[in-house]
């Protein structure tokens, strides 16, 4: 992709990883959005050798103001991949899906990460509502009302495993724009 957008910055590790991929490919841009970027994390990201590949935006990821700021960094015709990894409640992920789906290029994805929560609702430190209140439920609901997106796990092109199903923290996460 030309642009990788990720909601949820935390320590910035995935932003740095994506920036490294962009550098290796010789092109691309990473936009990281968070409601509150901790000052020490911002300093570390901005001091990193890959910082020039990253734009940080602070604010509510689903707000019109933040979405408009993100759009200002995307040129027309750019291939865009969106990863939603901030607040994992179903309601918030649905708001992000609605806010960002228009930026996703045909053939690319918007990914609602950490849907595995639904399978962890009954473990220590889990929450009973995770069974229905999770990113996978949001992605499935979104796909039902947006026929231009299909839930489609990317193929495993180099798997030597005998597994027949993907082992993932991101079930029902990959929404491909058709």
Predicted feature locations:
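S-adenosylmethionine/decaboxylated-SAM
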Residues: 1-178
């Amino acid at each position: 992709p030309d642009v990788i957008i990720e909601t949820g910055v935390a320590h910035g590790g995935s932003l740095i990883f994506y920036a490294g991929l962009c550098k290796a490919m010789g092109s691309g841009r990473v936009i990281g959005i968070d409601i509150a970027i901790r000052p020490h994390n911002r300093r570390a990201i901005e001091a990193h050798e890959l910082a020039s590949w990253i734009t940080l935006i602070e604010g509510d990821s689903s707000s019109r103001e933040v979405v408009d700021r993100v759009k200002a960094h995307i040129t027309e015709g750019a291939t865009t991949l969106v990863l939603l990894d901030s607040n994992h409640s179903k309601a918030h992920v649905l708001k992000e899906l609605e806010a960002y789906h228009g930026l996703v290029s045909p053939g690319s994805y918007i990914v609602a990460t950490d849907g595995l929560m639904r399978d962890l609702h009954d473990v220590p430190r889990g929450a009973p509502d995770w069974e229905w209140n999770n990113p996978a439920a949001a992605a499935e609901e979104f796909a039902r009302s947006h026929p231009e997106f299909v839930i489609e796990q990317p193929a495993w092109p180099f798997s030597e495993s005998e597994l027949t199903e993907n082992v993932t923290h991101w079930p029902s996460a990959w929404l491909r724009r058709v």
